[in-house]
Amino acid sequence: MTVVQKNAAGNEEHAFSTKFGFRDIAIKNGLVYINGEKVLFKGANLQDTHPMTGRTVDIETMLNDVKMFKQANMNTVRTSHYPRQAKMNAMFDYYGLYCMDEADLECHKSWEDGGESRGITNEDSWKAQYVDRTVRMVYRDRNFPSIIFWSLGNESGGGKNFGHTYAAVRALDPRPIHYEGASRAGTAHSDIYSEMYPLLTEVDDHANGKTDNSYPYYGNTQGQPYFMCEYAHAMGNAVGNLQEYWDAIESSKYGIGGCIWDWADQSIYDAKDIKNGNFEVDGMNKYRTGSDYPGPHQGNFVNNGLVTADRAWSPELTNVKYVYQYVKFISFDAATKQLTVRNNYDFIPLDGFYLRYAVLADGVEVENGVVEMPSMAPNAEGVVVLPYTATAADGIELMLNVELCCKEEQSWAGADYVVATEQYTLAERDTASFALNGNGELVLENVSGGYRVKSSVMEMTFAANGTMNSWVVNGKDLIVKGPEYDNYRWVENDKPTESLGDYNEKNGIQSKSATFTLAADRKSVNVVINASGWFCKYRFNYTITADGALLIDATYNVVPKDARRIGLSLVFPADFEQVEYYAYGPFENYVDRRGGSLLGRYYTTVSDMFEPYPKPQSMANREGLRDLLLFNPDEGYGMKVQTRGDVAFSLLHHSDIELKRAGHTWELQKGDVYAHFDCAQKGIGNGSCGNVATLDKYLIPQGGEYGCSLLFTPVTGIESGIGEVTDNILRFNVVDGKLVCEGTLEVSDSLAVYNMGGVKVAEAAVAHPTDALEISLQGLPHGSYIVVVKKASGTFVHKVLL
């Protein structure tokens, strides 16, 4: 559209062109409709932030943010807590994001006073300033069709000045008006019933028009659209139980969605480091937080992002993408091979997508294929038949992965981009007890007040109470510290309960004893360890065989009501660097944040399991461990671990205590390999802001009993992975902005690098047989990436840390 301004004489004074759009917005029966379709708003709060330029954000970063929102299945931006540059509103229009445009108005003193009758929000002398800050936003932005809501401000109480701003905005524009403080103060300055950091019980109450006793004025009794303007506080290792929030919203009477707090970490580079070009330490961004500067600050509290300060995708965002996905895979009937699909897009049919499926046997892909999607209308269900032929063999776990992919390139992603995923179990894992086959005889000796178990190839030594002091096989030291009960975890979401006893940096064991028994046939030694303490009673039943294998049958009885983890830890040598595992992955996941993680066989290193959270904390967990190979890649020896029961694991070059005590990621020094094998771990939750505790179903119940089995088998001469599924070991290193892949590579092999959202960022094909291949990763933000290697022997998925 071209706009021309003329003077009184009819002469043209000024002309400009602008894009413009038309759409209808209506609130009906407590829900929001756009062009006649009910819409749920799946979003995040977006701040102006850049690690180099602070609050000045360049066009490239704006475009990147908008595209990443789309890639993560988000459709809504709340401009917390001020309007964006007008050019970014134009990006929302072009790429297709709904916007809650928020006025630059925030005064916490009024908010903290509880609102309606106190502070400047209620003083006549401030009326003009309140109205001015709001109406100038409307005047500037009202021609952007992407703006669906006006927001009057943030955390400023609910005084009468918001009544004036509401009236002024309503006189200018008919769009819905939002103000969270109105809900908090029980006033009528909002068309939306809005909350911050609600409990799930509050979502259920207020999204269904119920009242509660949290505040005397709380309760969505008018049946307004219910919106979580801030929720799922993404500080550090966070965003637990997001699925439950959306189950509640989608099943409610008035729920219309919410915006996660928030999009990007707000770390910055120090001015001196910028001047000196000193941006990294050992490959880690040298970011600063409030703790690095004098004066009032909130430490790390502004690092609440779903992406890093330089916009690297996080494991949290991958879970968000899964929960927000528009296409739901409702069920799969293995007998008929029929997949029931629901299209929850509001305006898009599914003929622009195709379905890709893969069958995995014990984590290894054995079959794949592609199926065309029918033209399924928005908000309709349909059935797709998957023509795979693979069948399960005895004891083999069989899984089915499905992915919905874009047929053509989008403005925000390339062709083949995956917008929705799901996984189904076709055959359960083997649960039979382990059969130990150690050949040779053992000797059990009492030495120096402890015990020694040895054979012709191995030796273990123990203290009298069962503590393992050494484990040597074929002359190789396999441990730095033997298995011990461990309950310690520290993430920022646990801070509200940090005063509880389980935050003691020791494991709280008060008594521990052991019995040692050599079997009559001398083929095994049995060690039974019983211990009790403040947090847990446990029994470890060790079975040791002559080849150096160790079977641990563990039973735990939990004492406290808020335990963080129940399991064991041990420390391996620092050069046990290479990792192959069969569990949920390839990125970090937890019991309440596993969406988008798929059970499969993955490859990485201990160094690459690290996640660059600005404030170091416990991390790297993988749920559902089946088996694991941890080894020294230079000398080809290490440890194989197999499990029975529910086991989660993590491997890092840092202890949890080291992570807690460190102020910055870039201050950490790599050490030995710290391994956790947990029977249970508390969910991550959302506790770093608001009284949002981990859901009961993701807690470790007080008095609960847990059990699992771990079989540790020393291995040597490693040239292939577990099950001999690889032809060779591939090793990845990042050197001068290049990813270097080392190993045997043939002409038929190819490599592709993806961020954790599935965006392909680099690829290379092998032109001739080689033992090294380089891929440039220049310009990519530091973070975790997925390398998919396709060889004649199969497809292998590696996680690397750039």
Task: State where each predicted segment sits.
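Short edge beta-strand/loop segments characteristic of extracellular beta-sandwich folds
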Residues: Q338-D346, T555, K738-T744
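Terminal connector regions
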Residues: V3-Q5, E12-A15, A390-D430
